[in-house]
């Protein structure tokens, strides 16, 4: 991809944003090489694109695979790395090995991000690279309870978007200039963000949440979460899609399918989808916006999405604004929710 993509005179992005993007790219270029903590969300994807421009083959995108990363997100990360043309590696670890993470206290994202970024540094050492960078952007530090950012600081992770003052809106503009398919992608917080603080994170809970959300995605919903309240599924649907969720056909199908996954009770949250509603600082509406799951985070951790989380990682310690459903095709409710 040509560096000229970022030139202000192309009209693709405002001059101020282009200048910030060039500053971030130049800062990356001063590194001997970088490993980008990569979730495939918009923040880490822009960092990866800038790093690829600046360093060529000395830039590597790395995604952390664990129980909290949906399989679909890993597949998407591989696809986006291919779009960018950057080498893509994966590392595997388990947050469930850490009792502090499993306990799911207010610092869960700190414990997760510390482990995740630690594996990134292991990968960097194996590759002979000294710098690990992430997708933290300039909006992230002011977004409420974000313990994952403490891990980024303690581990001396390079955050080129933050250092250049690039906001979330500017990240999306830069992604559009690069022609990235994730320019409008919301951050996808890690699956543990669906479990209320204080309730242990277990593989069983993570698995049933992932399967439940996969169903909603297959049924055509765009903005949603399934929160696991110890056997009670609280389904959150974006406000602009809530009317569809009130259809009796959906109610019957979601109750049947989620019960089969092991949920004892299935409820629809009439407040709709909002970011971080089970986190210590939860309760914001989806329309209010949030940085995300290193974006999406990771992150939750960022975005939920963090970026990040994290997963690669994104900066979001929880979820991020959901996309609109304006382009969703009309559906035959009788056929959409198969028995």
Feature names for model-found ranges:
Residues 203-224, 252-256:
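Short amphipathic alpha-helix segments
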Residues 230, 234-247:
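A short interface-forming secondary-structure element
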Residues 222-229, 269-274:
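C-terminal boundary motif of the adenylate-forming
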Residues 307, 311-339:
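Long, low-complexity, intrinsically disordered segments
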Residues 187-201:
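N-terminal presequence-like segments and adjacent domain-start helices
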Residues 163-169, 197-214:
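Active-site glycine- and acidic-residue-rich loops that bind
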Residues 2-177, 218, 233, 253-263, ...:
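ATP-dependent adenylation/nucleotidyltransferase module used to activate substrates
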Residues 167-172, 180-189, 223-224:
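Short, structured loop/turn "capping" segments at alpha-beta junctions
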């Amino acid at each position: 991809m040509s560096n000229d993509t970022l030139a202000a005179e192309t009209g693709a992005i405002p001059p101020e944003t282009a200048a910030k993007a060039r500053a971030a790219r130049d800062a990356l270029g001063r590194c001997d090489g970088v490993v980008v903590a990569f979730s495939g969300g918009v923040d880490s994807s822009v960092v990866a694109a800038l790093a690829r421009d600046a360093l060529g083959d000395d830039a590597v995108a790395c995604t952390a695979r664990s129980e909290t990363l949906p399989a679909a997100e890993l597949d998407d990360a591989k696809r986006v790395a291919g779009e960018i043309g950057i080498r893509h590696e994966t590392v595997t670890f388990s947050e469930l090995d850490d009792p502090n993470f499993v306990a799911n206290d207010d610092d869960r994202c700190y414990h997760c991000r510390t482990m995740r970024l630690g594996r990134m540094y292991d990968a960097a050492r194996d590759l002979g690279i000294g710098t690990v960078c992430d997708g933290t952007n300039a909006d992230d530090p002011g977004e409420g309870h974000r313990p994952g950012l403490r891990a980024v600081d303690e581990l001396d992770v390079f955050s080129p978007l933050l250092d250049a003052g690039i906001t979330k809106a500017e990240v999306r503009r830069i992604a559009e200039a690069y022609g990235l398919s994730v320019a409008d992608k919301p951050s996808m917080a890690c699956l543990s963000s669906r479990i209320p603080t204080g309730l242990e994170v277990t593989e069983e809970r993570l698995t049933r949440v992932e399967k439940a959300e996969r169903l909603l995605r297959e049924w055509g919903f765009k903005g949603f979460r399934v929160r696991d309240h110890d056997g009670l599924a609280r389904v959150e649907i974006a406000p602009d899609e809530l009317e569809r969720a009130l259809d009796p056909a959906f109610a019957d199908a979601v109750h049947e399918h989620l019960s089969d996954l092991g949920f004892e009770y299935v409820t629809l949250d009439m407040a709709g989808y909002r970011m971080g509603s089970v986190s210590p600082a939860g309760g914001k509406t989806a329309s209010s916006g949030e940085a995300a799951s290193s974006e999406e985070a990771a992150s939750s951790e960022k975005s939920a999405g963090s970026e990040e989380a994290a997963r690669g990682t994104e900066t979001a310690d929880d979820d991020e604004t959901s996309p609109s459903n304006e382009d969703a095709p009309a559906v035959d409710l009788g056929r959409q929710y198969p028995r």
